Curated annotation (Swiss-Prot):
Gene3D superfamilies reported in the protein's UniProt record: Collagenase (Catalytic Domain), Disintegrin domain
Every Disintegrin domain range: 404-489
Glycosylation sites: N219, N502
UniProt-recorded name of the protein: Zinc metalloproteinase-disintegrin-like TSV-DM
Positions where Pyrrolidone carboxylic acid occurs in the chain: Q192
Needed cofactors: Zn(2+)
Family stated for the protein in its record: Belongs to the venom metalloproteinase (M12B) family. P-III subfamily. P-IIIc sub-subfamily.
Tissue specificity comment: Expressed by the venom gland.
GO cellular component: extracellular region; plasma membrane
Single GO BP term: proteolysis
Activity regulation (UniProt): Inhibited by EDTA and DTT, and partially inhibited by EGTA, but not inhibited by PMSF and NEM.
Function, as annotated: Snake venom zinc metalloprotease that hydrolyzes the alpha-chain (FGA) and more slowly the beta-chain (FGB) of fibrinogen. Inhibits cell proliferation and induces cell morphologic changes transiently on human umbilical vein endothelial cells.
Length: 621
């Protein structure tokens, strides 16, 4: 029986506040000294982990008692996490270190709804927590045979450089052919709505340059700790816009740099992105990579990234300067640049986020919060709707979680029926919090077909139809799950403008609207004849990077041609063509190309049955 391990730490406050001390975070004035005393109560037969999965800390801040709740960040590392560094003679060394029992936590202050915390417990307690709107830092005091820690406000750290740091992004460093246009809920196609509702995961890779290696004393352990501390905060920030950041790997250029890292940010970013595409992507699958550098960029720039380039093999990249001793300020810069990768530009003066400064403010200040502004959230949503980047949809499996299952962490994991938290916090009458199994007599604890611990009756509607290709989903009476059903693939839809495929109706009209806005339409047939040329944009498919011209019967399965009804555009044959993402703007597989025919994945207009039985994964139902 797995039980929650609750650890209580009592912190006794030293009877005086220090006036000045030099810590890892810098020269600190006005700090409190605390002594953690760990009290552990393990259930009988439980195995002691090196780092517990759930902990509490009791301490006084400004003389007032607070309780800090912490849970291990189980999403920090991917299952295939790896590290690469180089020997003194330049030999590449790649390892897969054990990261299951890691020491990085997130949490909050009890009775403070807006509080956050990011703490490492590797060697004492190091990190920060937000209390009543103010940021506090905690780190061990380096005293012999002492467990003393310092707690202090960020404002009490002496600043080495008073000049504010800024992001180098102006408008866009990767020129997209078209601006992001606002999309209302009613204008969304079924595909866009489904994409928007799906959970998002960024498989993140981090590279540290040679200056970083030298800066941290040529000590790989010290440098990797710095990186883990930073990414743990990045995870916490991006979670605010429902993006999970999983660290899939890191590379430390311990021998020499793989590119010429220089003080001109735009040049360094371009060189890093080129190296990433040519080298890194061939050895490690990931969705986005950043370079963390110890070089000082020209001017106040702290980072730079390509805007809206997530998942792009060339441009899904960013660079960040390790500009401050306090890792959470570096993490804010990194999260900011990752926000650019995810389609978010800088906040304007009218943008708000219930804090003095939001994540996407152009200037990184000591008041920076972990909140995204209303503008950022809207811009990110519009980017997702318009571009639907696919690499962030790949959700890790339950078996990919690197930490062992823990009853009481609110995640239903392998071997558990339910998980409602600890016995003290559980409010679920269906779930036994001591073993994460259903209570006696209960059939279920959650699910669209679960009501008061019992399965809903067979035939009960659990999800209405979302489109004409969808069907109302019904409970079976034997499960809490609401199984997704949809109309037969190949059934005509949208007034015979398309054929159903797995609950959606892919049509050229919807694809034009997604590319050019709500008033767009499909071009005349004559425009599609350009696909017979087999040039850089007009083709049906590629074979070994050679573009194959469309046969006459297949011209509507190549590049999509649309009418953009905006007053300034008189061109009857508009396309979207991006040299770095050539598949964008092609007619999607499954789209109707003639009566009774649909495009397959090879750019051929074939019979409906053949299209849905081709290698695209379509299946006739």
């Amino acid at each position: 029986m797995i039980q929650v391990l609750l650890v209580t730490i009592c912190l006794a406050v030293f009877p005086y506040q220090g006036s000045s001390i030099i810590l890892e975070s810098g020269n600190v004035n006005d700090y409190e000294v605390v002594y953690p005393r760990k009290v552990t109560s393990l259930p009988k037969g439980a195995v002691q982990q090196k780092y517990e999965d759930a902990m509490q800390y009791e301490l006084k801040v400004n003389g007032e008692p607070v309780v800090l709740h912490l849970e291990k960040n189980k999403g920090l590392f991917s299952k295939d996490y790896s590290e690469t560094h180089y020997s003194p003679d330049g030999r590449k060394i790649t390892t897969k270190p054990p990261v299951k029992d890691h020491c990085y936590y997130h949490g909050h202050i009890q009775n403070d709804a807006d509080s956050t915390a990011s703490i490492s417990a590797c060697n004492g307690l190091k990190g920060h927590f937000k209390l009543q709107g103010e940021m506090y830092l905690i780190e061990p005091l380096k005293l012999p045979d002492s467990e003393a820690h310092a707690v202090f406000k960020y404002e009490n750290v002496e600043k080495e450089d008073e000049a504010p740091k800024m992001c180098g992004v102006t408008e866009t460093n990767w020129e997209s052919d078209e601006p992001i246009k606002e999309a209302s809920q009613s204008n969304l196609t079924p595909e866009q709505q489904s994409y928007l509702n799906a959970p998002k995961y960024v498989k993140f890779f981090l590279v540290a340059d040679h200056i970083m290696y030298l800066k941290y004393g040529r000590n790989l352990t010290t440098l990797r700790t710095r990186i883990f501390d930073t990414v743990n905060v990045v995870y916490l920030i991006l979670l605010r816009i429902n993006i999970h950041v999983l660290l899939v790997g890191m590379e430390i250029w311990s021998h020499k740099d793989k590119i010429i890292v220089q003080s001109v940010p735009a040049v360094t970013l371009k060189l890093f992105a080129t190296w990433r595409e040519a080298d890194l992507l061939k050895h490690k699958s990931h969705g986005c990579a950043h370079l963390l550098t110890g070089i000082n960029f020209n001017g106040p720039t702290a980072g730079l990234a390509y805007l809206g380039a997530i998942c792009n093999p060339m441009y899904s990249a960013g660079i960040v300067q390790d500009h401050n001793k306090i890792h959470h300020l570096v993490a804010i810069a990194m999260a900011h640049e990752l926000g650019h990768n995810l389609g978010i530009n800088h906040d304007k003066d009218t943008c708000t986020c219930r804090a003095k400064a939001c994540v996407m403010a152009g200037t990184i200040s000591c008041d920076a919060s972990y909140l995204f502004s209303d503008c950022s959230r809207q811009e990110h949503r519009e980017f997702l709707i318009k571009n639907m980047p696919q690499c962030i949809l790949k959700k890790p499996l339950k078996t990919d979680v690197v930490s062992p299952p823990v009853c009481g962490n609110y995640f239903v994991e392998v071997g558990e029926d339910c998980d409602c938290g600890s016995p003290a916090t559980c409010r679920d009458s269906c779930c036994n919090p001591t073993n994460c199994k259903l209570r006696q007599g209960a059939q279920c604890a959650e699910g669209l077909c679960c009501d008061q611990c019992r399965f809903k009756g067979a035939g009960t509607e659990c999800r209405p139809a979302s489109s004409e290709c969808d069907m109302a989903d019904l409970c079976t009476g034997r499960s809490a799950e609401c199984t997704d059903r949809f109309q037969r693939n190949g059934q005509p839809c949208q007034n015979n403008n398309g054929y159903c495929y797995n609950g959606t109706c892919p049509s050229m009209t919807d694809q034009c609207i997604a590319l050019f806005g709500p008033n767009a339409a499909v071009s005349q047939d004559a425009c599609f004849q350009f696909n017979r040329e087999g040039n850089h944009y007009g083709y049906c498919r590629k074979e070994q990077n050679t573009k194959i011209a469309c046969e006459p019967e297949n011209v509507k399965c190549g590049r999509l041609y649309c009418i953009d009804s905006s007053p300034a555009n008189k061109n009857p044959c508009n396309i979207v063509y991006l040299p770095n993402d050539e598949e964008k703007g092609m007619v999607l597989a499954g789209t109707k190309c003639a009566d009774g025919r649909a495009c397959n994945s090879n750019g051929q207009c074939v019979g409906v049955n053949g299209a849905y039985k081709s290698t695209t994964g379509f299946s006739q139902i």
